[in-house]
Amino acid sequence: MNDTIPATGHLLGAADIRRIAADAGISPTKKFGQNFVIDPGTVRRIVREAGVTAADHVMEVGPGLGSLTLAILETGATMTAVEIDPPLAERLPGTVAEFMPEATSRLTVVNRDALTVTPENVPDFSDDASFTLVANLPYNVATPILLTLLERFDNLGSFLVMVQKEVADRLAAKPGSKIYGTPSVKLAWYGTAERVGTIGRNVFWPAPNVDSALVRFTRYQADDPAAPGASNSTADGGTQRELVFRLIDAAFGQRRKTLHAALKTIAPSEAFSIAGIDPTRRGETLTIAEFTALAKAIESCGDGDEAQ
């Protein structure tokens, strides 16, 4: 995207973080799930795992006081940081100007809730064939943020995020495991996820009560035959995703029930036969490909709402 050379500057340590917070009158809040990274080695590791280069356009959600922001900018990348907290959004450009002044022109800060971000109100990525998300996500909204951005931005090609360890395990879980659930299978609609490392509690201020982990995700290419939605047009010209996600929600909303019982208002009996799926199985055993096959079968039977 650009031929910018990597920037030189100073990444934030614990003393820097506390000084910036004090100068700006900022205290970490539970409301926004704020735990600021105080270890330069950790943010460099995140950027390294994400594979960010000067050619990339990066979105960061929840930049906080700028620890990860500076590490991303250090690569020479261009980035847009989405911050919900007004004082933090206002402070971030000044922090970059202080610690990495030559990188200020490559940073755009958007004061907005990430769950409200769309290509229309944040058009920064409209000209990109693909962009990446690199973030230390607020633990309480990590999964909704990821699924929302993947739904709204077709060109969000990959992400590397730090989340609560239990959330990371669920995002990367495979069918049949006890932690496989709605986040796992919905994320699998878009691409492949894997856990790529753990992060200790002592690299944060304040230290959280839980461990953290890194999740790497790669989106399916449009022509990838492995993509569940590779052939996803429906009779009404929309996509199958809405029906597939409806099946997922119903199946995991009553995960101990058989598919026949959990999906009785959505899937007619013949749909299971058409899809080649045993209706006595539970939703926690189905792959995203099987949920997609069942959705296609329901469409071929007509209106799933009339299932008996």
Swiss-Prot record:
Places the protein is found: Cytoplasm
EC number: 2.1.1.182
Source organism superkingdom: Bacteria
Enzyme superclass (EC): transferase
GO molecular function, one term: RNA binding
GO CC term (a single one): cytosol
Gene: rsmA
Extent of the signal sequence: none
Alphabetical list of NCBIfam families matching this protein: ksgA (TIGR00755)
Record-listed S-adenosyl-L-methionine binding positions: 35, 37, 62, 83, 113, 136
Family: Belongs to the class I-like SAM-binding methyltransferase superfamily. rRNA adenine N(6)-methyltransferase family. RsmA subfamily.
Catalytic reaction(s) noted: adenosine(1518)/adenosine(1519) in 16S rRNA + 4 S-adenosyl-L-methionine = N(6)-dimethyladenosine(1518)/N(6)-dimethyladenosine(1519) in 16S rRNA + 4 S-adenosyl-L-homocysteine + 4 H(+)
Pfam families in the cross-refs: RrnaAD
Keyword list, A-Z: Cytoplasm, Methyltransferase, RNA-binding, rRNA processing, S-adenosyl-L-methionine, Transferase
Function, in words: Specifically dimethylates two adjacent adenosines (A1518 and A1519) in the loop of a conserved hairpin near the 3'-end of 16S rRNA in the 30S particle. May play a critical role in biogenesis of 30S subunits.
InterPro entries in alphabetical order: KsgA/Erm, rRNA_Ade_diMease-like_C, rRNA_Ade_Mease_Trfase_CS, rRNA_Ade_methylase_Trfase_N, rRNA_adenine_dimethylase, SAM-dependent_MTases_sf
UniProt protein name: Ribosomal RNA small subunit methyltransferase A
